[in-house]
Amino acid sequence: MKRFIAVLVTVFTCLLGANNAFAADDSNALQQIKESGTLRVGLSTFVPWAMRDKQGDLIGFEVDVAKRLAADAGLKVEFVPTAWDGIIPALLAGKFDVIIGGLTITPERNMSVLFTHPYSYSAVQMVASKKLASKMTTIADYNKRSVTIAVRSGAYPVQTARKLFPKAKLRQFDDETQAFQEVLNGNAQAALASTPTPEQMVIKNPESLFMPFKKPLTRYATGFAIRQGDFNLLNFLNNWIQVRTEDGWLNNRYQYWFKTTDWQNLVNENN
């Protein structure tokens, strides 16, 4: 009996130590950020979430969000531009503290990272070639082996394409500009992207492009992403999102970047 009790005490002590270790790790990220005085933000450039202006500085919805978040916390902000298909691995490797980059909340991604509550919502739309697809107006028209659809690698529209157009050939690119160029060059019938980019591309190229569907193909929520276990940081970020949602600031920035074109003359044409 004494031996059994001794074993139980040992097990309990180990579990208590493990819990204390987890608790220490839990507060580690937020404490480290406070001590460093800088919030490191991972993002990938794509219009109008994040892009370069004519002076080479980052601007966009996510840039505004990250700057306001850091300012409210009394921190400096450091942006870490990262290729989209490698942004989650970079977060897990400690290259930055948080992803603020229009990252769609999905169960698959949630297996690797912690997501905050949504801070914005978006949708996926299709842009098609007038030359190659003028008579294609249904999902079935694009769900054929003879159809090529261009998308940005690692982005949520990839999932939409695979779900709705499993028979089509999917061609993936490092950025959306290349995907749309593939359609303009006549190498793909269509491209998928998050709004408002498809609408803007049609406005810029009315003679070449059109939108075959009036309603979005899918809708989705976006959240900040942090490393698993950083629950104190998660609590802070969720509370910040709630405060800036309730006071209307997030909606104000969303309306400016997604519902107007007032900012377009600021943008570097190479974005």
Indicate residue ranges for each PLM-predicted region.
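Ligand-binding clefts/hinges and TM-proximal coupling segments of bilobed small-molecule sensing domains
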Residues: 23-25, 156-173, 212, 242-271
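Alpha-to-beta junction loops
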Residues: 39-40, 74-76, 93-101, 146-148, ...
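Extracytoplasmic small-molecule ligand-binding "clamshell" domains
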Residues: 24-102, 111
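Periplasmic-binding protein-like
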Residues: 121-128, 195, 199-241, 260-271
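Flexible hinge/capping segments at coil-to-helix
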Residues: 129-147
